[in-house]
Structures are given as structure tokens and as C-alpha cells.
Amino acid sequence: MKLSDLRPNPGANKRRKRVGRGPGSGHGKTATRGHKGQKSRSGGLKDPRRFEGGRSTTLMRLPKRGMQGQVPGEIKRPRYQGVNLKDLARFEGEVTPELLVRAGLLKKGYRLKILGEGEAKPLKVVAHAFSKSALEKLKAAGGEPVLLEA
């Protein structure tokens, strides 16, 4: 047996339907789209997830909720990312947000919040925020929480 003898199983490769290629193809002229109407045109249908035949859509009938965004620009709020105490167990000495970014535990541009899942080690932890449980566990283990000013 040679590589050139290999063939796919019968029926495994279905041929692509080529439409609009003349009457002999069986899919010429209207190219399987039928006659006239919106669905036969290029651009086709309106989005069926939103368009309801011209009546007031469900989305438009529901009330607006929350903030709709500001005209000059979006209000930028600081984004926090939580890191659990159990994830800090592999570090020694001082733990900073920069160190956690390099270690892949904190996304760049996010503020660091230490959460209390897991056991604490006696570390100096520098963060933007601490949960109550994380603060208690860290102090009980002899660690030093340092709050960063934002």
C-alpha cells in the first residue's frame, strides 16, 4: 500500500453545492432562492433575533434600566481582581501586584483585592483591598497587610 492509494470512505466527502452556474447545473437562474421577495435578494433577511415584522419589538417595549452611558465618554471605574490566600502560598517574603502580574495571577491594569479562601502564610502583602476574612487570617498567621492608596 502506498500513500497515493489512500482514498476517503465513500460518502465521507460531500461535494459543495455550486449555485448560479447555468441551467445545466440544476441550480442556475434563481440559485435555489425561489422567485422575488426579500429573502431572494442580497442582504436577505432582517435579523430574526430582533426584527418582529415591523411591530414594536420586545426590546423597545421594555423599560430602560441602569446607566445608559455618558455623552463625553464612559465613566471609568477601577476594576478589581480577587486573588485568594491559597494562591499566595507559593510566594516568600513580600507579595506585590507587580509580582502577581508577572506570575500570571493578576491581569495588567486591574487593582488587587486579597480574598480569604485558603490558609495564610506570614507574608507582607501589598494590595489595593482586602476582604475581612483575608485580613483576619493574614494577621493571625503573622503576616503584614499593606493597603495601597489608589
UniProtKB/Swiss-Prot annotation:
Annotated region (Disordered) at 1-60
Q: At the top level of its lineage, which domain of life is listed? A: Bacteria
Q: Name one GO cellular component term.
A: cytosolic large ribosomal subunit
PROSITE patterns annotated for this entry?
A: RIBOSOMAL_L15
- Biased composition, Basic residues: where in the chain? 30-39
Please note every region of biased composition (Basic and acidic residues).
Answer: 44-53
| Gene Ontology molecular-function annotations | rRNA binding; structural constituent of ribosome
Q: What processes does the entry annotate via GO biological process terms?
A: translation
**What interactions and quaternary structure are annotated?**
Part of the 50S ribosomal subunit.
State the function annotated in the UniProt record. Answer: Binds to the 23S rRNA.
Membership in a protein family: Belongs to the universal ribosomal protein uL15 family.
Descriptive protein name: Large ribosomal subunit protein uL15
